[in-house]
From Swiss-Prot:
CDD domains: PIN_YqxD-like. NCBIfam families: PRK00124.1. It comes from Azorhizobium caulinodans (strain ATCC 43989 / DSM 5975 / JCM 20966 / LMG 6465 / NBRC 14845 / NCIMB 13405 / ORS 571). It comes from the Bacteria. Belongs to the UPF0178 family. This is UPF0178 protein AZC_4000. InterPro entries: UPF0178. HAMAP family: UPF0178.
């Protein structure tokens, strides 16, 4: 008797996520469960598979909630590089809202770059922020999310 395959679950670091609507559409198409995690109530579609999780305010509270639950077969959507590193370490697929997939091979350099840029900003060497979110970013995100889901299905995870 074989064990029942694990379902693919999406976790969204939702407070500043610009692709929530796209996540809901993809989740509906693939019949996936989604945990929308935030420090404040966020409107979500009426769908039994989409779960709103409101955590206490405070640094990293939403990140901790997500990181403590994810494992292989889950997909995390976040722009937070330290959270991405924690989730990659736990075996989850991690995608930034701009479509960049974080993997074991790339997360170390990405985290180091983030830390360097944070230090430069703190020292006043860099005053600008990230570039504006674009339609190209949205399209890249949709492609990356679909690719991650298809890859997980091929690996035996279910919806």
């Amino acid at each position: 008797m074989s064990a029942r395959p694990e379902p693919i679950t999406l976790y969204v670091d939702a407070d500043a996520c610009p692709v929530k609507a796209e996540i809901y559409k993809v989740a509906e198409r693939h019949a996936l469960h989604v945990h929308v995690v935030s420090n404040q109530p966020i409107a979500i579609p009426r769908d039994d598979r989409i779960h709103r999780v409101v955590v206490a305010s405070g640094p990293d509270v939403a990140d901790d909630w997500i990181a403590e639950r994810v494992s292989r077969g889950d997909v995390v959507v976040t722009a937070d590089i330290p959270l991405a590193a924690r989730c990659v370490k736990a075996g989850a697929d991690v995608i930034a809202p701009n479509g960049k997939a974080h993997t074991e091979a790339t997360i170390g350099a990405t985290l180091a770059t983030r830390n360097l840029m944070d230090d430069l900003r703190s020292a006043g060497q860099i005053t600008g922020g990230p570039k504006p979110f674009s339609p190209r970013d949205r399209s890249a995100f949709l492609s990356a999310l679909d690719l991650a889901i298809v890859r997980l299905k091929r690996a035996g995870f279910t919806t």
